[in-house]
Amino acid sequence: MLSGQPPDLAAFSESGLFSLYRAILRELKSRGVIRTENAPVGDYAEYLVATALGGRLAPNAEKAWDVLGNDGEKIQVKARVVSGPAEPGQLQLSPFRSFGFDAAVIVLLSAADYAVSRASKVPRHVVESTAVYRQHVNGSVLFARPEIMGHPEATDLTATLRAAQSGRENV
């Protein structure tokens, strides 16, 4: 049981909040309450991409894309928390269940504090031709391996997302 008052969360930076959240997730996992530590990753990555690219988040009902770029580009966002070096399985993204987007932005966040480790924008045709359909997940699976993240047609967005993340730290 928590004694006294809970900490003043408003006093924490965003990375400080994520570090605290990570510690909570680790404890819940050690107790068998949860099985993974990826809970807030997708929402946070979508938020960062929308902020960094000056876009807007898709309505919750939209299934094919997550962010509408300021140029009308439909972007699917996939994210994972990774340790350094990445452990087996950490690079497998959630399945693509449709390809109704123009590009996918793949975001890898540090397990320590959710800082952006790597981010790449990959054209849909590259994702579609590389992802492998898996019936048991009813979708196409892609791994955020170097050959995808550094694909000749991919755009490295690491610095752009880090700048958006850094700008949010001062809020």
Regions found by a protein language model. Give the residues of each.
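Nucleic-acid endonuclease domains
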Residues: 1-171
